[in-house]
Amino acid sequence: MKNSIREEIINHPAKKLFDIVIDIESYPEYIPWCTRMVINERKDSEIYADMYVQYKFILAQKFGSHVKFNSNNLTIETHYIEGPLKDLTTNWKFEKINSKKSKIIFNVNFEF
């Protein structure tokens, strides 16, 4: 399994960045290869969703995911359910530095 961790300081409030990432319905508007998002189930702090991805001439693929999030701690965990990969998990953490600046920690694990 491959792992990548990235940390960035961003000049935006942590809560605003969290809200952008958790708004998965909007992904097709700004992620070029994401053609459609389908929300299968939404609970208080969980979402079951399918992302449809098409890259160049490759047929569209569906990635099913279980997303857990905590609005108070500003964390998001995504667990892969189905699709063309063997495994995929992501973790987001948004830390407030001050009212206008935050630190994003993004961790992704995947296996083809």
Question: Where are the predicted features?
Answer:
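Short solvent-exposed loop/turn micro-motifs enriched in small/polar/acidic residues
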Residues: M1, Y30-P32, L59-A60, L85-D87
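Hydrophobic ligand-binding cavity/cleft-lining segments
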Residues: M1-E46
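Intrinsic-disorder/low-complexity, polar/charged segments enriched in Ser/Thr/Lys/Arg/Asp/Glu/Gln
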Residues: N3-E7, E46-Y48, K62-G64, T75, ...
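Hydrophobic/aromatic beta-strand elements that line small-molecule binding cavities or substrate pockets
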Residues: R6-E8, M37-I39, V53, F63-F69, ...
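Short strand-connecting beta-turns/loops that link adjacent beta-strands
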Residues: P13, R42-S45, N72, I97-K101
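Conserved short hydrophobic patches within well-ordered secondary structure
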Residues: I24-Y27, A49-V53, F110
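Glycine-rich portal/gate segments that line the openings of hydrophobic small-molecule binding cavities
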Residues: V38-E82
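Beta-strand/loop substructures that line and gate deep hydrophobic ligand-binding cavities in soluble
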Residues: H79-F112
